[in-house]
A protein has these predicted regions:
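Blade-loop segments of beta-propeller domains
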Residues: 78-115
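Repeated scaffold domains used in trafficking and secretory/extracellular systems
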Residues: 49-54, 87-97, 135-146, 184-194, ...
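Short loop/turn segments that connect beta-strands within beta-propeller blades
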Residues: 74-78, 121-125, 170-174, 214-218, ...
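A short beta-strand motif characteristic of beta-propeller blades
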Residues: 39-46, 78-84, 126-134, 174-183, ...
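A short helix->beta-strand "capping" segment at the edge of beta-propeller domains
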Residues: 24-49
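Structural motif
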Residues: 70-71, 109-118, 160-167, 208-213, ...
Length: 262
């Protein structure tokens, strides 16, 4: 579950029963402020018994992080394998060179120093490494992404009153720099992805609000938008397509970026 939410019971479903549902580009349109016009070109139904959190892809498989368990699907939505069910809150994930990195936290509204990055073998989903990043977060380590050998981990909250915070680490998760962005995402940042073609980050709140910001996190470069469903994590499939978590619908949305360069 996202920070600020109480756990709600959902109908448990076997992820192996995933079905795909192709939809017309005109049937579901997510419109936002110029230049953002997102067209949902496809959808996968991904049943979850403890809430979708993160999503990542290597272009051949899709990795879906539920609150306490990681799953691997092919691009048609067929379950390939499932990782171990673990404790603590698991949030955003990112795929890098055969590994899946997950932001993990105690996620306590009163504050906690339990913040880690878990590292999984992308083929088997075996948990192979943990990095302690507890000194750099206070509530919940939420989203995670990667750029040019460095990792960027964002904080999420239980309210809408905090400026967005992103922490940069090197490849060994040694601290590099903190960034404060002049924007207050609802419940903080739930997902972020680096878009190399335009040197921007796309950042998702836990509400319908999202934005793009340049690679230096300069607030004056920020352009915000608004989706028509509550957001979570996202992953770049290719130069034209994002995969966006729609947790409430238990789907993955394939979103065409109408203004994204080839």
């Amino acid at each position: 579950m996202g920070c600020g939410e109480s756990q709600q019971s959902t109908t448990s479903a076997n992820p192996s029963t995933v079905k795909t549902s192709d939809i017309s580009i005109h049937e579901a349109v997510v419109e936002a402020e110029d230049p953002f016009v997102f067209h949902v070109t496809g959808r996968l139904q991904i049943p979850a018994d403890d809430g979708q959190q993160g999503v990542a892809t290597d272009g051949k498989f899709i990795y879906v992080q539920n609150t306490q368990q990681l799953f691997k699907y092919d691009l048609d939505g067929k379950l390939v394998t499932a990782g171990p069910k673990l404790m603590l809150h698991h949030g955003g994930i990112v795929y890098v060179k055969g590994l899946v990195y997950a932001a993990v936290s105690g996620c306590d509204s009163n504050g906690t120093n339990q913040h880690r990055v878990h590292v999984y073998n992308a083929q088997s989903l075996e948990l192979i490494e943990k990095h302690d990043i507890g000194a750099h977060f206070t509530v919940c380590a939420g989203g995670i992404t990667h750029r040019k050998g460095h990792f960027f981990v964002a904080e999420s909250f239980f309210d809408d009153d905090h400026l967005d915070k992103i922490v940069e680490f090197n490849a060994s998760f040694q601290h590099i720099k903190d960034y404060r962005i002049d924007f207050k995402s609802p419940y903080g940042i739930q997902g972020l992805e680096y878009l190399p073609g335009i040197d921007q980050f796309q950042i998702h709140s836990h509400g319908k609000v999202f934005y793009r910001i340049n690679g230096r996190f300069e607030s004056n470069s920020l352009i915000s938008g608004k989706a028509n469903f509550e957001l979570q994590d996202l992953a770049r499939l290719d130069a034209n397509t994002l995969i966006v978590n729609n947790r409430q619908a238990q789907t993955l949305e394939f979103v065409k970026l109408a203004t994204y360069p080839d």
